[in-house]
Every structure is written in structure tokens, then in C-alpha cells.
Design a protein with these regions (language model features):
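Single conserved hydrophobic/aromatic residue that forms the stacking wall/gate
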Residues: 1-10
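Beta1/beta-strand and adjacent pyrophosphate-binding region of the FAD-binding site
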Residues: 26-38
Length: 454
């Protein structure tokens, strides 16, 4: 493959530029290429490989799981609608394997155990994969991608594939191919990021005996602490530290406002800010919260927790009307029920109260309620062999606030993987596969599709 750094893949905005070209070896030829090994990517790779398809996955970090492992995000968010297990299929396997290791408390999960679970599922499926391997370009023409260009530890190489699945979160592969996308809200503002953390030396029994009865109880002294100078910034929205095991906790605390997860300089500033702020959070917990008097920060994530960047425009945009009417679709690949959770991008007045009202009441479903996820949100317009699965799929910003979390990514990923296998085998455009046949295969894989009628 011949590639040029000055190709139209990259739009130079300002400053100097350098032009060079090189011959890139084609290291792999495969049926399905998966960019990204987070919850959507690993689900896609496993589902495609178990369908009898040759699969290669490139993951830029050192393990599968993305935010749930490298970024230390300690919770999946809800997998059920209170009655039915919505993340069935790949999510069922993950949950069962964590349970077998006694590594899932019902809320938080053991991050090292989750890494092993993903490793085992990927290896058993027969999918090929490489860690420490980042997609840095694509070769595409006429609405069809032919090659992904990757940078690994041994240098740059290309992968030729029939079908490509973008499960990078940010939609890096689809972006480099030129697919149309939206980003953030109407004014471009995106949800803040968080740097999650691991904590030790917590007396959970004491905390449970003394915790206040209120939403986000670990935040109840934040204002007092800010006024006392413990915090150099005011951020009252704090999910908190969740119990993982004996004295251990997973922290989802603090925000990096204004971070753009597609800009390395912005993410660098966010990481610096969040690591500095951990000292302030430690002081807060030690001084104000019972059971945390001796708590210590054991580790912070090696990746920034990013909630929102690009959403690629597909054959259908899942929207707030669909969410509110608990929509059912003919091409449904699953259903989901997590409330819309858009973290405020600042606290000038009333933002947190509005968020809590929306999350706890306006957008909260009753038990057994859910909304449908149509296959068409996985297929970006303009490309015959490209899927976007995970938080970069086609949805408006409000629904993205619900579906972006890990169980939603499992549902989308497994559908993209099986769909890609079908498209590769039949040499069919991803926009034209038989969705009823896809649904049958998803049910065989274990997916929850209550509205499918055979």
C-alpha cells in the first residue's frame, strides 16, 4: 500500500507541513477489521469470529476494555430493565465469568478480572488481535474502504479487509475515511471527562453505617469543603467511590471541563488537571467522610475517561422521540433502558439540579420498559463496508447520553460483528444485508430481541 502524509485523509489547518511517502507492508488480509478493543470492539470481534469469519482487531492500548479497564471506570451501568437482561449475548458471558471469579459486586467490578475475561473471550473465539496498535489512516475510494493503516510497536503496516468496524469511541477510522459526523451539542460543547481511580484502606462497614440518605451521598460535604479551601474548584457532581472489595474502591470523581477527546493537547491538559486534583479529593475524603479517614489513591487511569466526541450519521439517527415512546423497530438489534445521563459542562447555576431531575425522573423508565436500537444506526452513510459501533454510532445527543455506556456498547458491538460477517460472506453492502437473518443469528448468539417474530 502506498500512503502519503499529505493525502486528503488529513486536512491541514494551519502552520507548516511536511510531505513524505513510503511503501507500507500489508501485514494481514482479513474478512473483518475491527478498530478498537473497548466493549463494542471486543464484542464485535468475538461475534464475528464465532460466525466463522476471519477477524483482526487493532487496539491502541495494552488491554481490551477501553474505559472499563485502561481508564479504570469501575461500573458498567445497568445491564437490565429491572426484569429482563438487556445486554444478553456478549454481556451475559462477561457477567457470568465475573460472577464465577466473585469479581462483580452488583455495582462495581474488579478491573483486573475484567481484563482477563475479555482476554479469554477473544482468545477462545479465534479472532486475531494486537494491543499497542493504533489505526492512523485508511485507504478508501468510491465509498469503499480497502485498507486500514496501523502503527504498531514494530512500525507501520496495513490491513486489507472486506468490512471495517469502527469501535474506537471517537470514531477515528470513520473520521479518517471521511464519514459525516456530529460532535457535541448545538454549540459544540461536550460532556466533561473524568479520570477514574482506585482507592485502598477504606472502612466500608463504617461508611455504610453513616452514609446520608441522598443522591450521590459522598458529595454532601463538597460545598462546605470548597468554602473551607479544600478544593480549588467547585464541582458538586460526584458519583463517588464504589465498593469493589475489602477496603478497595473504584472512584469516579471529579470532572475535566472543556476537554476534547479528539485533541491530544486538550486531553493532556485534562490529565494534568485531574491528577493534581486527586490530592484535593483525598483530603476531602479523609477529612469529611466517615470510613474514608485513611483512604489513599492507589492508582489513576492510564487513559482519560471520555464521555462524548463524534457521532457518525447513519441510515437512521436514533432520537429522543424514540426514547420517550419506547420505540420498537423492524430491524431491532437489541433494547436498552439506561436513563439519559448528560453530565453538565459547568455549574453556573441550576445545572446539577436539572441533571438530577432529568436522570431521576424525566428520563427514568419504569421496570420492564426499554427502547429499541435499530440496526441502521450502525451503518454510516456514504460507505458500503463500514460500521460505527459504540458511542460513535448514529444517535442524537440526548439518546447518546443513554446508549454510550458499556452494556449499550456490548449490544451494538455484537450486532456489528455478526452483520459484518454476513456482509463479508455475501459480498453485500452493510446497508443491504438481510436484517431478519441478522436477528436470527443474534438470537442464536444470545441477544435479547423480544419483538422478533420468526
Amino acid at each position: 500500500v502506498r500512503s502519503s502524509a499529505a493525502s486528503d485523509v488529513y486536512k491541514r489547518q494551519k502552520g507548516d507541513s511536511v510531505s513524505f511517502s513510503l511503501d507500507i507492508p500489508v501485514k494481514y488480509g482479513t474478512d473483518v477489521f475491527v478498530a478498537g478493543g473497548g466493549p463494542a470492539g471486543v464484542a464485535a470481534a468475538v461475534a464475528a469470529a464465532e460466525s466463522g469469519t476471519d477477524v483482526y482487531l487493532a487496539e491502541s492500548l495494552s488491554c481490551f476494555g477501553g474505559m472499563g479497564t485502561s481508564a479504570l471506570v469501575p461500573v458498567f451501568m445497568q445491564m437490565t430493565d429491572g426484569i429482563n437482561f438487556l445486554a444478553a449475548g456478549f454481556g451475559s458471558r462477561v457477567r457470568k465469568m465475573l460472577d464465577s471469579e466473585k469479581s462483580f459486586s452488583g455495582g462495581a467490578h474488579d478491573i483486573e478480572a475484567l481484563k482477563r475475561v475479555y482476554d479469554g473471550l477473544a482468545e477462545k473465539s479465534g479472532a486475531k488481535f494486537s494491543f499497542c496498535t493504533k489505526v492512523i489512516g485508511v485507504k478508501a475510494s468510491g465509498g469503499k474502504i480497502d485498507y486500514a493503516v496501523c502503527s504498531g510497536l514494530g512500525g507501520i503496516f496495513a490491513v486489507k479487509s472486506k468490512v471495517f468496524i469502527d469501535a474506537t469511541g471517537n470514531g477515528d477510522l470513520a473520521y479518517m475515511a471521511g464519514a459525516k459526523y456530529e460532535k457535541g451539542g448545538e454549540n459544540g460543547a461536550m460532556m466533561p471527562g473524568s479520570l477514574c481511580s482506585m482507592w485502598c484502606s477504606i472502612d466500608w462497614k463504617k461508611w455504610r453505617a453513616n452514609r446520608p440518605d441522598m443522591p450521590q451521598p459522598q458529595s454532601f460535604k463538597v460545598k462546605e469543603a470548597y468554602e473551607a479551601g479544600v478544593f480549588s474548584f467547585y464541582d458538586p457532581h460526584m458519583t463517588g467511590i464504589m465498593e469493589i472489595g475489602d477496603g478497595l474502591g473504584g472512584g469516579n470523581i471529579g470532572h475535566a471541563f472543556g476537554v476534547d477527546g479528539t485533541d491530544e493537547d486538550s486531553v493532556t491538559r485534562a490529565l494534568l488537571h485531574c491528577r493534581k486534583s486527586m490530592r484535593e479529593y483525598k483530603n476531602y475524603y479523609n477529612k469529611y467522610l466517615p470510613g474514608f479517614e485513611n483512604a489513599k489513591v492507589a492508582a489513576t487511569g492510564s487513559a482519560m475517561g471520555i464521555r462524548e466526541t463524534r457521532r457518525f450519521v447513519g441510515d437512521y439517527v436514533l432520537n429522543i422521540d424514540d426514547y420517550m415512546k419506547r420505540a420498537v423497530f423492524d430491524d431491532e438489534i437489541g433494547r436498552y433502558a439506561y436513563p439519559i445521563d448528560i453530565h453538565p459542562s459547568g455549574f453556573k447555576g441550576g445545572e446539577l439540579e436539572k441533571h438530577r431531575m432529568e436522570f431521576d425522573r424525566l428520563y427514568k423508565y419504569a421496570k420492564g420498559e426499554s427502547y429499541g436500537i435499530p440496526y441502521r444506526i450502525l451503518t454510516p452513510k456514504g460507505f458500503s463496508n463500514l460500521y460505527a459501533a459504540g458511542r460513535c454510532a448514529s444517535m442524537d445527543r440526548l439518546v447518546h447520553g443513554s446508549l454510550r455506556v458499556m452494556p449499550g456498547c456490548f449490544i451494538m458491538g455484537q450486532a456489528a460483528g455478526i452483520g459484518a460477517s454476513m456482509a463479508a460472506a455475501s459480498k453485500t453492502s452493510v446497508h443491504e444485508i438481510d436484517t431478519r437473518e441478522l436477528q436470527k443469528k443474534l438470537i442464536k448468539f444470545g441477544a435479547y430481541l423480544p419483538n422478533f417474530k420468526s
